[in-house]
C-alpha cells in the first residue's frame, strides 16, 4: 500500500514568540489537495516546512513517505514548487530558464531542452518561449512558474496561491492546467484563500485557521452533498413542526426551508407535509452546501 501524500505528527512552527503552526496532526491522501484558509492562517509556513525550507520547531512531517528533515534532498527530487511570488529573471527567456531548471534537477542538457519545450507547450507558452520574462503578462508569468515546477516530472507539486492576480480568463486557464496535471499522474497541493478555486480544482480539503487544522476530509464530505430547499406560501411554523416530527433536519429563514432527511425520497416526505398543513409551495429543488458555507460553519463551531 502506498504511503500518504503528507503525514503530520504534532507539527509546530514558531517565529520567536509567534506561533505560526500549532500541534498539527493528520494524514492527507494522494490526489488533488486544497489547503485553504485566510491570509495569515499559516498556509505558506506549512508549505515551507513540507518543502524542508523551514525546520519544524516541534514534531515531524513526511511527504511521499519521506521525512522533511532527514530525507530532504530525496524528497525535494520528487516534488515541485510554484511560489506565490515569482522572482523570475526579467532578462532571461522562458526557454533558457526552463532548460536551466531541468538541468538543476539532473536532466542532461539535450533532454533538458526537449523537456523545457514540452512543458512550455503544455502551459501554452510555446510561441513565447524565446521572449524575456520582463515582457510577460501576469498570466504568462504564472504559467511559466507552473512550468518550472513540473519540468523535472515530479510526483507532487505545491502551488502557493497559483491564481493570485489573474483576471477571469487567466484564472480559467490556470484551473484547466492544474486539472490537467492529474492526467499526467501528478498530485497537487493548491494553497488558496479563494474557496471557489479549491472547489474547482481539488478533491480533498485541508482547512487551516490560526495555525491549526480545523478540517481534513474529502471535499464531498466537507460540502455535505445535496439537501432539499423549499419555499412555502404560508404557515411555516406548521411545516417546520411537521417535518421535525418525521425526523427531518430543518433550517428555516422565513418561508424558506433547507430540509435534510434520511428518507429515500425526501421530496415525497416534504410534499406530504405540505399537503397535510395546506401551506402551499412556491418552489422546491436541490440545495448544495458550498465550501464557503462549510468553512464559515466550521469557524462558528456547533450551534
Describe each PLM feature range:
Residues 157-161:
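Catalytic Walker B motif of ABC-type/P-loop ATPase nucleotide-binding domains
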Residues 262-303:
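C-terminal coupling/interaction segments
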